[in-house]
Curated annotation (Swiss-Prot):
UniProt protein name: Chaperonin GroEL
Catalytic class of the enzyme: isomerase
Function: Together with its co-chaperonin GroES, plays an essential role in assisting protein folding. The GroEL-GroES system forms a nano-cage that allows encapsulation of the non-native substrate proteins and provides a physical environment optimized to promote and accelerate protein folding.
Name of the gene encoding the protein in the UniProt record: groEL
PROSITE patterns the record matches: CHAPERONINS_CPN60
Amino acid sequence: MAAKQITFNADARMALKRGVDKLADAVKVTLGPKGRNVIIEKKFGAPTVTKDGVTVAKEIELEDKLENVGAQMVKEVASKTSDVAGDGTTTATVLAQAILTAGLKSVTAGANPMDLKRGIDKAVEVVVAELRKMSQEVQDKNRIAQVATISANGDKAIGQLIADAFEKVGKDGVITVEEAKGTETTLEVVEGMQFDRGYLSPYFVTNPDTMEAVLEDAYILIHDKKISAMKDLLPILEKVVQTGRPLLIIAEDVEGEALATLVVNKLRGVLKVAAVKAPGFGDRRKAMLEDIAILTGGTVISEEKGYRLENATLDYLGQAERIIVDKDNTTIVGGKGDPAQIKARANQIRQQIEETTSDYDREKLQERLAKLAGGVAVLKIGAATEPEMKEKKARVEDALHATRAAVEEGIVPGGGVAYIRAIAALDKVEVENEDQKIGVQIVQRALEEPLRQIAANAGWEGSIVVQRVKEGQGDFGFNAQTEEFGNLLEQGVIDPTKVARTALENAASVAGLLLTTEAVVAEKPEKEKAAAPSPGDMDF
Protein backbone atom coordinates (compact mmCIF):
# COMPACT_ATOMS: atom_id res chain seq x y z
CA MET A 1 0.00 0.00 0.00
CA ALA A 2 1.42 3.39 -1.02
CA ALA A 3 2.27 5.92 1.69
CA LYS A 4 -0.32 8.63 2.36
CA GLN A 5 0.10 12.35 2.79
CA ILE A 6 -2.15 13.84 5.51
CA THR A 7 -2.87 17.56 5.60
CA PHE A 8 -4.84 19.36 8.33
CA ASN A 9 -6.89 22.51 9.01
CA ALA A 10 -6.19 25.66 7.01
CA ASP A 11 -3.53 23.97 4.84
CA ALA A 12 -6.02 21.28 3.79
CA ARG A 13 -8.79 23.77 3.09
CA MET A 14 -6.56 26.13 1.11
CA ALA A 15 -5.24 23.25 -1.03
CA LEU A 16 -8.81 22.13 -1.75
CA LYS A 17 -9.75 25.71 -2.63
CA ARG A 18 -6.87 26.00 -5.10
CA GLY A 19 -8.18 22.89 -6.87
CA VAL A 20 -11.75 24.20 -6.85
CA ASP A 21 -10.61 27.54 -8.28
CA LYS A 22 -8.62 25.95 -11.10
CA LEU A 23 -11.58 23.85 -12.20
CA ALA A 24 -14.20 26.57 -11.67
CA ASP A 25 -12.17 29.22 -13.53
CA ALA A 26 -11.92 26.93 -16.56
CA VAL A 27 -15.64 26.09 -16.45
CA LYS A 28 -17.15 29.50 -15.72
CA VAL A 29 -15.87 31.15 -18.92
CA THR A 30 -18.55 29.11 -20.74
CA LEU A 31 -21.49 30.63 -18.79
CA GLY A 32 -24.23 32.53 -20.59
CA PRO A 33 -24.98 33.28 -24.25
CA LYS A 34 -21.68 35.17 -24.64
CA GLY A 35 -19.70 32.44 -22.87
CA ARG A 36 -16.37 31.55 -24.49
CA ASN A 37 -15.27 28.22 -25.94
CA VAL A 38 -12.87 25.83 -24.25
CA ILE A 39 -10.68 23.60 -26.43
CA ILE A 40 -9.90 20.20 -24.96
CA GLU A 41 -6.90 18.32 -26.31
CA LYS A 42 -7.43 14.59 -26.86
CA LYS A 43 -4.82 11.84 -26.84
CA PHE A 44 -6.26 10.54 -30.11
CA GLY A 45 -8.22 12.35 -32.79
CA ALA A 46 -9.21 15.97 -33.17
CA PRO A 47 -9.49 18.29 -30.16
CA THR A 48 -12.99 18.93 -28.76
CA VAL A 49 -14.33 22.48 -28.83
CA THR A 50 -17.11 22.99 -26.29
CA LYS A 51 -19.19 25.54 -24.43
CA ASP A 52 -20.66 22.90 -22.14
CA GLY A 53 -19.52 23.25 -18.53
CA VAL A 54 -19.77 19.59 -17.57
CA THR A 55 -17.70 18.48 -20.59
CA VAL A 56 -14.89 20.82 -19.50
CA ALA A 57 -15.17 19.72 -15.85
CA LYS A 58 -14.98 16.01 -16.71
CA GLU A 59 -11.69 16.49 -18.57
CA ILE A 60 -9.87 18.19 -15.67
CA GLU A 61 -7.40 16.16 -13.61
CA LEU A 62 -4.83 18.10 -11.55
CA GLU A 63 -1.24 17.06 -10.86
CA ASP A 64 -1.23 18.08 -7.18
CA LYS A 65 -3.08 15.32 -5.32
CA LEU A 66 -4.66 17.63 -2.71
CA GLU A 67 -5.80 20.19 -5.25
CA ASN A 68 -7.20 17.36 -7.34
CA VAL A 69 -9.43 16.25 -4.44
CA GLY A 70 -11.05 19.73 -4.42
CA ALA A 71 -11.43 19.73 -8.19
CA GLN A 72 -13.04 16.27 -8.17
CA MET A 73 -15.56 17.36 -5.51
CA VAL A 74 -16.72 20.24 -7.71
CA LYS A 75 -16.68 18.02 -10.78
CA GLU A 76 -19.24 15.92 -8.87
CA VAL A 77 -21.44 19.05 -8.52
CA ALA A 78 -21.39 19.58 -12.29
CA SER A 79 -22.04 15.97 -13.29
CA LYS A 80 -24.77 15.43 -10.65
CA THR A 81 -26.58 18.58 -11.82
CA SER A 82 -26.24 17.47 -15.44
CA ASP A 83 -27.60 13.98 -14.64
CA VAL A 84 -30.65 15.29 -12.76
CA ALA A 85 -31.53 18.44 -14.70
CA GLY A 86 -29.54 18.28 -17.95
CA ASP A 87 -28.28 21.84 -17.67
CA GLY A 88 -27.06 24.32 -15.05
CA THR A 89 -23.66 22.64 -14.66
CA THR A 90 -21.70 25.88 -15.03
CA THR A 91 -24.10 27.75 -12.72
CA ALA A 92 -23.66 25.03 -10.09
CA THR A 93 -19.87 25.29 -10.36
CA VAL A 94 -19.95 29.10 -10.05
CA LEU A 95 -22.23 28.89 -6.98
CA ALA A 96 -20.05 26.23 -5.32
CA GLN A 97 -16.93 28.35 -5.83
CA ALA A 98 -18.65 31.49 -4.49
CA ILE A 99 -20.01 29.74 -1.35
CA LEU A 100 -16.65 28.09 -0.66
CA THR A 101 -14.61 31.29 -1.15
CA ALA A 102 -16.79 33.38 1.18
CA GLY A 103 -17.11 30.49 3.64
CA LEU A 104 -13.34 29.94 3.92
CA LYS A 105 -12.78 33.63 4.70
CA SER A 106 -15.25 33.33 7.59
CA VAL A 107 -13.69 30.08 8.86
CA THR A 108 -10.22 31.66 8.74
CA ALA A 109 -11.63 34.62 10.71
CA GLY A 110 -12.77 32.20 13.42
CA ALA A 111 -16.36 31.23 12.51
CA ASN A 112 -17.56 27.72 13.41
CA PRO A 113 -17.71 25.68 10.15
CA MET A 114 -20.63 23.52 11.37
CA ASP A 115 -22.78 26.57 12.16
CA LEU A 116 -21.85 28.12 8.81
CA LYS A 117 -23.03 24.94 7.09
CA ARG A 118 -26.32 24.96 9.05
CA GLY A 119 -26.86 28.59 8.02
CA ILE A 120 -26.10 27.74 4.37
CA ASP A 121 -28.54 24.80 4.43
CA LYS A 122 -31.33 26.93 5.93
CA ALA A 123 -30.75 29.62 3.30
CA VAL A 124 -30.88 27.08 0.46
CA GLU A 125 -34.21 25.71 1.71
CA VAL A 126 -35.70 29.22 1.69
CA VAL A 127 -34.35 29.99 -1.81
CA VAL A 128 -35.71 26.70 -3.21
CA ALA A 129 -39.16 27.51 -1.76
CA GLU A 130 -38.92 30.99 -3.31
CA LEU A 131 -37.97 29.54 -6.73
CA ARG A 132 -41.00 27.22 -6.57
CA LYS A 133 -43.24 30.24 -5.85
CA MET A 134 -41.82 32.08 -8.87
CA SER A 135 -42.18 29.06 -11.14
CA GLN A 136 -44.60 29.19 -14.09
CA GLU A 137 -45.96 26.14 -15.92
CA VAL A 138 -44.78 25.37 -19.45
CA GLN A 139 -47.62 24.42 -21.77
CA ASP A 140 -47.36 26.10 -25.16
CA LYS A 141 -44.95 25.10 -27.91
CA ASN A 142 -43.38 28.56 -28.02
CA ARG A 143 -42.18 28.35 -24.40
CA ILE A 144 -40.78 24.85 -24.97
CA ALA A 145 -38.84 26.16 -27.99
CA GLN A 146 -37.42 29.02 -25.86
CA VAL A 147 -36.22 26.67 -23.10
CA ALA A 148 -34.63 24.31 -25.63
CA THR A 149 -32.98 27.19 -27.53
CA ILE A 150 -31.32 28.52 -24.36
CA SER A 151 -30.07 25.08 -23.30
CA ALA A 152 -28.69 24.52 -26.80
CA ASN A 153 -26.58 27.67 -26.37
CA GLY A 154 -28.91 29.92 -28.36
CA ASP A 155 -29.39 27.61 -31.38
CA LYS A 156 -32.95 28.40 -32.52
CA ALA A 157 -33.10 25.59 -35.09
CA ILE A 158 -32.44 22.97 -32.39
CA GLY A 159 -34.96 24.67 -30.08
CA GLN A 160 -37.65 24.50 -32.75
CA LEU A 161 -36.94 20.84 -33.56
CA ILE A 162 -37.22 19.84 -29.90
CA ALA A 163 -40.48 21.79 -29.56
CA ASP A 164 -41.82 19.98 -32.66
CA ALA A 165 -40.79 16.63 -31.16
CA PHE A 166 -42.60 17.39 -27.88
CA GLU A 167 -45.68 18.50 -29.80
CA LYS A 168 -45.72 15.24 -31.79
CA VAL A 169 -45.15 12.72 -28.98
CA GLY A 170 -46.31 14.58 -25.85
CA LYS A 171 -44.50 14.73 -22.53
CA ASP A 172 -44.69 10.94 -22.04
CA GLY A 173 -43.20 10.24 -25.48
CA VAL A 174 -39.63 9.10 -25.98
CA ILE A 175 -37.30 11.42 -27.89
CA THR A 176 -33.95 9.93 -28.87
CA VAL A 177 -30.89 11.57 -30.45
CA GLU A 178 -28.92 9.86 -33.23
CA GLU A 179 -26.22 10.86 -35.70
CA ALA A 180 -27.48 11.56 -39.22
CA LYS A 181 -25.71 10.39 -42.38
CA GLY A 182 -25.64 13.86 -44.00
CA THR A 183 -25.34 17.46 -42.79
CA GLU A 184 -29.09 18.05 -42.31
CA THR A 185 -30.62 17.88 -38.82
CA THR A 186 -34.07 16.29 -39.07
CA LEU A 187 -36.93 14.98 -36.94
CA GLU A 188 -38.55 11.60 -37.57
CA VAL A 189 -41.64 10.46 -35.69
CA VAL A 190 -42.70 6.84 -35.35
CA GLU A 191 -46.41 6.76 -34.65
CA GLY A 192 -48.03 3.85 -32.86
CA MET A 193 -46.14 1.10 -31.08
CA GLN A 194 -42.84 -0.05 -32.53
CA PHE A 195 -40.69 -2.91 -31.25
CA ASP A 196 -37.39 -4.26 -32.53
CA ARG A 197 -38.43 -7.61 -33.98
CA GLY A 198 -38.77 -8.20 -37.73
CA TYR A 199 -40.48 -10.92 -39.79
CA LEU A 200 -39.39 -14.52 -39.25
CA SER A 201 -39.34 -15.24 -43.00
CA PRO A 202 -38.84 -12.87 -45.96
CA TYR A 203 -41.68 -14.74 -47.71
CA PHE A 204 -44.13 -12.76 -45.56
CA VAL A 205 -43.24 -9.55 -47.47
CA THR A 206 -46.16 -7.88 -49.30
CA ASN A 207 -44.15 -5.06 -50.92
CA PRO A 208 -40.95 -6.40 -52.56
CA ASP A 209 -39.66 -2.86 -53.35
CA THR A 210 -39.45 -1.78 -49.71
CA MET A 211 -39.17 -5.36 -48.35
CA GLU A 212 -42.04 -4.71 -45.93
CA ALA A 213 -45.11 -6.69 -44.94
CA VAL A 214 -48.02 -4.24 -44.66
CA LEU A 215 -51.24 -5.57 -43.14
CA GLU A 216 -54.32 -3.31 -43.27
CA ASP A 217 -57.17 -3.73 -40.74
CA ALA A 218 -55.46 -6.79 -39.27
CA TYR A 219 -56.01 -9.25 -36.45
CA ILE A 220 -53.15 -9.87 -33.98
CA LEU A 221 -52.54 -13.20 -32.25
CA ILE A 222 -50.37 -12.83 -29.11
CA HIS A 223 -48.88 -16.00 -27.62
CA ASP A 224 -46.12 -16.33 -25.00
CA LYS A 225 -44.76 -19.75 -26.05
CA LYS A 226 -43.18 -21.28 -29.15
CA ILE A 227 -45.51 -22.40 -31.93
CA SER A 228 -44.13 -25.37 -33.85
CA ALA A 229 -47.06 -27.80 -34.36
CA MET A 230 -49.61 -26.75 -36.97
CA LYS A 231 -52.48 -28.53 -35.22
CA ASP A 232 -52.39 -25.95 -32.37
CA LEU A 233 -52.64 -23.04 -34.79
CA LEU A 234 -55.15 -24.51 -37.25
CA PRO A 235 -58.47 -23.76 -35.44
CA ILE A 236 -57.80 -20.02 -35.10
CA LEU A 237 -56.32 -19.75 -38.63
CA GLU A 238 -59.50 -21.22 -40.13
CA LYS A 239 -61.61 -18.65 -38.26
CA VAL A 240 -59.38 -15.77 -39.52
CA VAL A 241 -59.49 -17.05 -43.15
CA GLN A 242 -63.31 -16.91 -43.02
CA THR A 243 -63.18 -13.17 -42.15
CA GLY A 244 -60.82 -12.46 -45.07
CA ARG A 245 -58.67 -10.16 -42.90
CA PRO A 246 -54.86 -10.36 -42.52
CA LEU A 247 -53.19 -11.74 -39.37
CA LEU A 248 -50.02 -10.88 -37.43
CA ILE A 249 -48.70 -13.60 -35.12
CA ILE A 250 -46.51 -12.50 -32.19
CA ALA A 251 -45.04 -15.47 -30.29
CA GLU A 252 -41.83 -16.50 -28.51
CA ASP A 253 -40.97 -18.19 -31.81
CA VAL A 254 -42.72 -19.76 -34.79
CA GLU A 255 -40.76 -22.64 -36.28
CA GLY A 256 -40.81 -25.94 -38.15
CA GLU A 257 -44.11 -27.17 -39.51
CA ALA A 258 -46.10 -24.12 -38.31
CA LEU A 259 -43.79 -21.61 -40.05
CA ALA A 260 -43.64 -23.68 -43.25
CA THR A 261 -47.45 -23.95 -43.42
CA LEU A 262 -47.89 -20.19 -42.85
CA VAL A 263 -45.41 -19.39 -45.65
CA VAL A 264 -47.08 -21.81 -48.10
CA ASN A 265 -50.54 -20.38 -47.36
CA LYS A 266 -49.21 -16.83 -47.76
CA LEU A 267 -47.60 -17.66 -51.13
CA ARG A 268 -50.77 -19.37 -52.40
CA GLY A 269 -52.80 -16.31 -51.40
CA VAL A 270 -55.04 -18.26 -49.02
CA LEU A 271 -54.11 -16.08 -46.02
CA LYS A 272 -52.34 -12.73 -45.69
CA VAL A 273 -50.12 -13.38 -42.67
CA ALA A 274 -46.84 -12.36 -41.00
CA ALA A 275 -45.12 -13.80 -37.92
CA VAL A 276 -42.64 -12.07 -35.59
CA LYS A 277 -40.86 -12.99 -32.36
CA ALA A 278 -42.07 -11.38 -29.13
CA PRO A 279 -40.02 -8.34 -28.02
CA GLY A 280 -37.87 -8.25 -24.86
CA PHE A 281 -36.80 -11.06 -22.52
CA GLY A 282 -38.07 -12.67 -19.33
CA ASP A 283 -40.48 -10.61 -17.23
CA ARG A 284 -40.09 -7.61 -19.53
CA ARG A 285 -41.32 -9.74 -22.45
CA LYS A 286 -44.47 -10.68 -20.52
CA ALA A 287 -45.11 -7.03 -19.68
CA MET A 288 -44.58 -5.91 -23.30
CA LEU A 289 -46.92 -8.60 -24.65
CA GLU A 290 -49.53 -7.40 -22.15
CA ASP A 291 -48.97 -3.81 -23.39
CA ILE A 292 -49.56 -4.92 -27.01
CA ALA A 293 -52.69 -6.83 -25.95
CA ILE A 294 -54.14 -3.80 -24.14
CA LEU A 295 -53.25 -1.43 -27.00
CA THR A 296 -54.97 -3.65 -29.59
CA GLY A 297 -57.85 -4.95 -27.45
CA GLY A 298 -56.63 -8.55 -27.48
CA THR A 299 -55.62 -11.16 -24.90
CA VAL A 300 -52.22 -12.75 -24.32
CA ILE A 301 -52.87 -16.45 -24.94
CA SER A 302 -50.88 -17.85 -22.06
CA GLU A 303 -51.19 -21.20 -20.32
CA GLU A 304 -50.33 -19.43 -17.06
CA LYS A 305 -53.69 -17.67 -17.38
CA GLY A 306 -55.51 -20.85 -18.42
CA TYR A 307 -55.78 -20.01 -22.15
CA ARG A 308 -54.76 -22.61 -24.75
CA LEU A 309 -53.89 -21.83 -28.35
CA GLU A 310 -56.05 -24.62 -29.83
CA ASN A 311 -59.14 -23.23 -28.03
CA ALA A 312 -58.59 -19.59 -29.12
CA THR A 313 -61.45 -17.64 -30.74
CA LEU A 314 -61.54 -14.34 -32.64
CA ASP A 315 -62.40 -12.57 -29.34
CA TYR A 316 -58.87 -13.32 -28.11
CA LEU A 317 -57.26 -11.50 -31.05
CA GLY A 318 -56.20 -7.86 -30.99
CA GLN A 319 -56.99 -5.54 -33.90
CA ALA A 320 -55.15 -2.64 -35.53
CA GLU A 321 -55.74 -0.32 -38.48
CA ARG A 322 -52.30 -0.94 -39.97
CA ILE A 323 -49.24 -3.04 -39.22
CA ILE A 324 -45.87 -2.57 -40.94
CA VAL A 325 -43.22 -5.28 -40.52
CA ASP A 326 -39.71 -5.01 -41.99
CA LYS A 327 -36.68 -7.19 -41.35
CA ASP A 328 -35.80 -5.37 -38.09
CA ASN A 329 -38.94 -3.72 -36.69
CA THR A 330 -42.69 -4.13 -36.29
CA THR A 331 -44.94 -1.06 -36.03
CA ILE A 332 -48.57 -1.28 -34.93
CA VAL A 333 -50.58 1.83 -35.87
CA GLY A 334 -54.14 2.52 -34.68
CA GLY A 335 -54.57 -0.25 -32.10
CA LYS A 336 -58.26 -0.77 -31.34
CA GLY A 337 -57.95 -1.28 -27.58
CA ASP A 338 -60.27 0.28 -25.00
CA PRO A 339 -58.98 3.86 -24.28
CA ALA A 340 -59.86 3.53 -20.57
CA GLN A 341 -57.77 0.35 -20.26
CA ILE A 342 -54.86 1.92 -22.17
CA LYS A 343 -54.97 4.92 -19.80
CA ALA A 344 -55.08 2.66 -16.73
CA ARG A 345 -52.08 0.68 -18.04
CA ALA A 346 -50.16 3.93 -18.69
CA ASN A 347 -50.87 5.10 -15.12
CA GLN A 348 -49.66 1.76 -13.79
CA ILE A 349 -46.35 2.17 -15.68
CA ARG A 350 -46.02 5.76 -14.41
CA GLN A 351 -46.38 4.42 -10.86
CA GLN A 352 -43.60 1.88 -11.52
CA ILE A 353 -41.37 4.66 -12.91
CA GLU A 354 -41.77 6.62 -9.66
CA GLU A 355 -41.04 3.59 -7.49
CA THR A 356 -38.05 2.11 -9.32
CA THR A 357 -34.52 2.86 -8.10
CA SER A 358 -32.70 1.54 -11.18
CA ASP A 359 -31.93 4.01 -13.98
CA TYR A 360 -31.96 1.17 -16.52
CA ASP A 361 -35.42 0.00 -15.43
CA ARG A 362 -36.68 3.57 -15.44
CA GLU A 363 -35.47 4.07 -19.02
CA LYS A 364 -37.13 0.84 -20.18
CA LEU A 365 -40.40 1.70 -18.40
CA GLN A 366 -40.35 5.15 -19.99
CA GLU A 367 -39.97 3.53 -23.42
CA ARG A 368 -42.97 1.30 -22.72
CA LEU A 369 -45.01 4.30 -21.57
CA ALA A 370 -44.10 6.22 -24.72
CA LYS A 371 -45.18 3.35 -26.94
CA LEU A 372 -48.53 3.18 -25.17
CA ALA A 373 -49.16 6.90 -24.76
CA GLY A 374 -47.62 8.83 -27.59
CA GLY A 375 -44.95 7.53 -29.86
CA VAL A 376 -41.24 7.86 -30.43
CA ALA A 377 -39.44 10.81 -32.02
CA VAL A 378 -35.88 10.53 -33.33
CA LEU A 379 -33.74 13.66 -33.74
CA LYS A 380 -31.09 12.93 -36.40
CA ILE A 381 -28.21 15.36 -35.95
CA GLY A 382 -26.25 16.35 -39.04
CA ALA A 383 -22.96 18.27 -39.21
CA ALA A 384 -20.10 18.90 -41.62
CA THR A 385 -17.29 17.48 -39.46
CA GLU A 386 -16.87 14.92 -36.69
CA PRO A 387 -15.96 17.42 -33.90
CA GLU A 388 -18.95 19.60 -34.83
CA MET A 389 -21.22 16.55 -34.82
CA LYS A 390 -20.09 15.52 -31.31
CA GLU A 391 -20.48 19.05 -29.95
CA LYS A 392 -23.91 19.50 -31.54
CA LYS A 393 -25.16 16.12 -30.35
CA ALA A 394 -24.08 16.90 -26.77
CA ARG A 395 -25.92 20.25 -26.96
CA VAL A 396 -29.10 18.62 -28.26
CA GLU A 397 -29.02 16.00 -25.49
CA ASP A 398 -28.59 18.77 -22.88
CA ALA A 399 -31.39 20.83 -24.38
CA LEU A 400 -33.69 17.82 -24.45
CA HIS A 401 -32.99 17.04 -20.81
CA ALA A 402 -33.53 20.66 -19.73
CA THR A 403 -36.78 20.89 -21.70
CA ARG A 404 -38.08 17.80 -19.93
CA ALA A 405 -37.16 19.47 -16.62
CA ALA A 406 -39.09 22.60 -17.66
CA VAL A 407 -42.19 20.62 -18.58
CA GLU A 408 -41.89 18.78 -15.24
CA GLU A 409 -41.37 21.65 -12.75
CA GLY A 410 -41.99 24.85 -14.73
CA ILE A 411 -39.74 27.83 -15.53
CA VAL A 412 -38.30 30.94 -13.84
CA PRO A 413 -36.72 34.06 -15.41
CA GLY A 414 -33.22 33.15 -16.65
CA GLY A 415 -29.93 35.01 -16.75
CA GLY A 416 -29.36 34.57 -12.98
CA VAL A 417 -32.36 36.85 -12.21
CA ALA A 418 -34.39 34.21 -10.32
CA TYR A 419 -31.55 33.98 -7.77
CA ILE A 420 -31.38 37.78 -7.42
CA ARG A 421 -35.14 37.92 -6.73
CA ALA A 422 -34.79 35.22 -4.06
CA ILE A 423 -32.14 37.17 -2.09
CA ALA A 424 -34.69 39.38 -0.26
CA ALA A 425 -36.42 36.33 1.26
CA LEU A 426 -33.19 35.48 3.12
CA ASP A 427 -33.46 38.60 5.32
CA LYS A 428 -36.24 36.89 7.28
CA VAL A 429 -34.50 33.56 7.93
CA GLU A 430 -34.50 32.67 11.63
CA VAL A 431 -31.08 31.61 12.91
CA GLU A 432 -29.77 30.47 16.30
CA ASN A 433 -26.45 32.34 16.40
CA GLU A 434 -24.17 34.79 14.60
CA ASP A 435 -22.24 32.13 12.65
CA GLN A 436 -25.46 30.72 11.15
CA LYS A 437 -26.37 34.27 10.14
CA ILE A 438 -23.01 34.53 8.37
CA GLY A 439 -23.87 31.27 6.56
CA VAL A 440 -27.11 32.84 5.30
CA GLN A 441 -25.23 35.98 4.19
CA ILE A 442 -22.72 33.82 2.30
CA VAL A 443 -25.59 32.36 0.23
CA GLN A 444 -27.01 35.87 -0.31
CA ARG A 445 -23.70 36.98 -1.81
CA ALA A 446 -23.22 33.76 -3.79
CA LEU A 447 -26.64 34.13 -5.47
CA GLU A 448 -25.34 37.24 -7.28
CA GLU A 449 -22.40 35.35 -8.75
CA PRO A 450 -24.08 33.66 -11.78
CA LEU A 451 -25.37 37.05 -13.03
CA ARG A 452 -21.95 38.68 -12.44
CA GLN A 453 -20.28 35.93 -14.47
CA ILE A 454 -22.83 36.10 -17.32
CA ALA A 455 -22.27 39.88 -17.49
CA ALA A 456 -18.47 39.53 -17.29
CA ASN A 457 -18.44 36.97 -20.13
CA ALA A 458 -20.46 39.45 -22.22
CA GLY A 459 -17.82 42.12 -21.53
CA TRP A 460 -19.81 44.08 -18.92
CA GLU A 461 -18.88 45.02 -15.35
CA GLY A 462 -20.65 42.44 -13.17
CA SER A 463 -21.37 44.58 -10.10
CA ILE A 464 -22.99 47.39 -12.16
CA VAL A 465 -25.30 44.88 -13.90
CA VAL A 466 -26.21 43.23 -10.56
CA GLN A 467 -27.07 46.62 -9.04
CA ARG A 468 -29.22 47.59 -12.02
CA VAL A 469 -31.12 44.26 -11.92
CA LYS A 470 -31.65 44.57 -8.14
CA GLU A 471 -33.29 47.97 -8.71
CA GLY A 472 -35.81 46.34 -11.08
CA GLN A 473 -38.62 43.97 -10.12
CA GLY A 474 -40.09 40.63 -11.18
CA ASP A 475 -38.82 39.39 -14.54
CA PHE A 476 -36.67 42.49 -15.21
CA GLY A 477 -33.10 41.45 -15.97
CA PHE A 478 -30.06 41.58 -18.24
CA ASN A 479 -30.29 39.81 -21.61
CA ALA A 480 -26.63 39.07 -22.38
CA GLN A 481 -27.49 37.96 -25.93
CA THR A 482 -28.82 41.40 -26.95
CA GLU A 483 -26.90 43.23 -24.17
CA GLU A 484 -30.10 45.01 -23.11
CA PHE A 485 -32.13 45.22 -19.91
CA GLY A 486 -35.81 44.23 -20.06
CA ASN A 487 -38.47 41.64 -19.23
CA LEU A 488 -36.65 38.32 -19.59
CA LEU A 489 -39.75 36.09 -19.71
CA GLU A 490 -41.10 38.08 -22.66
CA GLN A 491 -37.71 37.90 -24.39
CA GLY A 492 -37.56 34.13 -23.88
CA VAL A 493 -34.60 34.19 -21.47
CA ILE A 494 -35.80 31.47 -19.11
CA ASP A 495 -34.43 28.62 -16.99
CA PRO A 496 -36.22 25.45 -15.95
CA THR A 497 -37.02 25.70 -12.21
CA LYS A 498 -35.53 22.23 -11.74
CA VAL A 499 -32.20 23.41 -13.19
CA ALA A 500 -32.01 26.50 -10.94
CA ARG A 501 -33.00 24.45 -7.89
CA THR A 502 -30.67 21.48 -8.52
CA ALA A 503 -27.68 23.72 -9.29
CA LEU A 504 -28.02 25.53 -5.94
CA GLU A 505 -28.73 22.40 -3.88
CA ASN A 506 -25.74 20.50 -5.28
CA ALA A 507 -23.40 23.51 -5.04
CA ALA A 508 -24.31 24.17 -1.39
CA SER A 509 -24.01 20.47 -0.54
CA VAL A 510 -20.43 20.13 -1.80
CA ALA A 511 -19.30 23.59 -0.63
CA GLY A 512 -20.66 22.74 2.84
CA LEU A 513 -18.66 19.50 2.88
CA LEU A 514 -15.46 21.28 1.83
CA LEU A 515 -15.94 23.99 4.50
CA THR A 516 -16.31 21.41 7.26
CA THR A 517 -13.21 19.47 6.16
CA GLU A 518 -10.44 19.28 8.79
CA ALA A 519 -8.09 16.78 7.16
CA VAL A 520 -7.32 15.45 3.70
CA VAL A 521 -5.66 12.08 3.11
CA ALA A 522 -4.09 11.77 -0.33
CA GLU A 523 -1.54 9.42 -1.89
CA LYS A 524 2.05 10.57 -1.77
CA PRO A 525 3.54 11.04 -5.23
CA GLU A 526 5.84 8.07 -5.83
CA LYS A 527 9.49 8.87 -6.34
CA GLU A 528 10.81 7.69 -9.69
CA LYS A 529 13.20 4.76 -9.14
CA ALA A 530 16.57 5.16 -10.86
CA ALA A 531 16.79 2.96 -13.94
CA ALA A 532 19.24 0.04 -13.78
CA PRO A 533 22.39 0.72 -15.80
CA SER A 534 22.41 -0.98 -19.18
CA PRO A 535 25.19 -3.52 -19.83
CA GLY A 536 26.71 -1.16 -22.38
CA ASP A 537 27.57 1.35 -19.63
CA MET A 538 29.73 -1.09 -17.66
CA ASP A 539 33.50 -1.15 -17.75
CA PHE A 540 34.99 -4.59 -18.18
